[in-house]
């Protein structure tokens, strides 16, 4: 399908405005991190929430931000304190949006998702977001958090028939731990 010539400049302007908005938000969030400025983070986040869903903000802004922060951290441009500061503010937003969903009963009851990180695993931001997405889709979730002893998961089998365990590892578990 051809686009009318008069629509092309409008489309170009929309694309430029969207990229500019994302770039501005990313820069504001990086500045908030560098200055440990929670207020700037919250103002930037609230401004984004006026235009986008939480899922859009996470995918379009937070993920690129975290990718960039990873590079900054690996090159010693930022300290672990900077990374922890911004990660905890993002976690706070995930918790808030997840809690809003938890007031409603799950609509999909055929599966229960149990989310956990194994012992010595502390990087939970991604798992928290998966928990949010599963709850958003109407599933019952049980979030167990970080450094969960794997042998303790067997208890859950007494309570639910169709459990899906969700985890990931950035530390290397032994084969015996996985079995």
Predicted regions and their residues:
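Long amphipathic alpha-helical segments
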Residues: 1-102
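C-terminal regulatory/effector modules of DNA-binding transcriptional regulators
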Residues: 77-179
